[in-house]
Every structure is written in structure tokens, then in C-alpha cells.
Amino acid sequence: MAKTKSKSSKPSSASKSQGGISKLILVLGLLTALLSSVVYFVEQNLEQFYIFDLKHLDDLSKRALAKHGEDTRAVVKHIVDELSEKNPEHVNVKEEWVFNNAGGAMGAMYIIHASVTEYLIIFGTAIGTEGHTGRHTADDYFHILSGTQLAYVPGEYAPEVYPAGSIHHLRRGDVKQYKMPEGCFALEYARGWIPPMLFFGFADGLSSTLDFPTLWDTTRITGREMINNLIKGKL
């Protein structure tokens, strides 16, 4: 009698596929858990990652204004010079101005510092703009250096008015309409989670202006500063 050949016990392609999906789900689950743990830890300890002091920025802005008055270029230089003396490894002293379109508003910015938990920029326009502040994952402080910034929230019948020397604090999660009339510039400082704010900063460029050279410059400078700060141990 001829021997009956036994069928091979190789797993079917369907079984392989199911096994691959299970492994992928497991890996994604582990990565999600790890990322959530890191985010939770950083969230509970955000204060220790900040290198800029709110009181110092306010005092510095006011001293620069008292010394240089309406010479905004000199005011900005005064601020950057002192910041670079205080934090030489984390301050970009090279003035690299780029346009910024966000929330319907348009101005220009100079990135002084960018990291995972903080950014510090000079933002403004010589001809005026207005738009949506965005709803952010960080507290945003506008130290007004020239001109007057206006802000509006639904239900009010009068604007919030922020002249030179004052601070407009946009709290994390809040949203306003804002206006920077002709010749308004501010030292803008954000502290909290910065990466999620980048989507707001890129949205207009990707969906409206399609100004890809400016998007590239913004990405290049922001990425360079964030990576350099990470390498130096600054989140």
C-alpha cells in the first residue's frame, strides 16, 4: 500500500496577515503608552524646562522702551543683546525675518528661540493686520514694543487695548480676535507645548497663500532651533 503523504502544516497567508496586524497593534499600543507617559511627565514638570522668566521679559521690554523710545529697531537689539548675554546657548542672534500668515493675519517674525516648551519671537507689521489668535496648547504673552494691539472676545462691546509697554496674555486654550494696527510690533513669548502650535502657523500657507519658499524658511529656522536646543538638553 502506498504511503499517504502528510499535508504540510505551514500557516495560511490569512494567519500570517492576522499575526502581522496583531504585532502592529501591540507596537502602536506600546508607543502610545510610552508617549502618553512622557507627555504626562513633562506636563507635570513644565516649569522646570523653562529658561525665560516672565518678570525679566517684562522688565527688559520696559527698560528697552525707556532707553530707546520709538526706535523699535534699537529696542529689539537691546532685548536680544541682553537675552543672548543671559542665555548665550539658546538665543538666535541672527535676524532672520520671515513672513508669517496665521489665522487670517499677516506679519513678519524673527525667531529668537524655539524649543519644545518655549518660543520667543519678534512679531509685527508696519502696515497693520488682524485675525484669529488660534486656540493654543501654550500660554502666549505679547509684550508690546510699538503701536497698540487690540483684542476682542464675544459678548463684549469694547476692545481690550494694549499700548506699548503693556502685556497681552492669551491664556492657554483661550481664543480672541486680535488686531495690530500700523506700526505695531511685539516680543511674543509662548510657554507650554509648542509643536502643536505649528499646525496653526502652517495652515494658511498650505491652504491659502501657497507661499512655499516662506513655509520652507519657517520650517528650516524653527526646526534648526528646536533640534539645536534638544541636542543641548533643552526641551
Curated annotation (Swiss-Prot):
It catalyses: fecosterol = episterol. GO terms for molecular function: isomerase activity. It is an enzyme of class 5 (isomerase). Its EC number is 5.-.-.-. GO terms for biological process: ergosterol biosynthetic process. It is found in: Endoplasmic reticulum membrane. The keyword Membrane applies. In Fusarium, the biosynthesis pathway of the sterol precursors leading to the prevalent sterol ergosterol differs from yeast. The ringsystem of lanosterol in S.cerevisiae is firstly demethylised in three enzymatic steps leading to the intermediate zymosterol and secondly a methyl group is added to zymosterol by the sterol 24-C-methyltransferase to form fecosterol. In Fusarium, lanosterol is firstly transmethylated by the sterol 24-C-methyltransferase leading to the intermediate eburicol and secondly demethylated in three steps to form fecosterol. The third module or late pathway involves the ergosterol synthesis itself through consecutive reactions that mainly occur in the endoplasmic reticulum (ER) membrane. Firstly, the squalene synthase ERG9 catalyzes the condensation of 2 farnesyl pyrophosphate moieties to form squalene, which is the precursor of all steroids. This is C-8 sterol isomerase ERG2. It comes from Gibberella zeae (strain ATCC MYA-4620 / CBS 123657 / FGSC 9075 / NRRL 31084 / PH-1) (Wheat head blight fungus). The lineage of its organism: Eukaryota, Fungi, Dikarya, Ascomycota, Pezizomycotina.
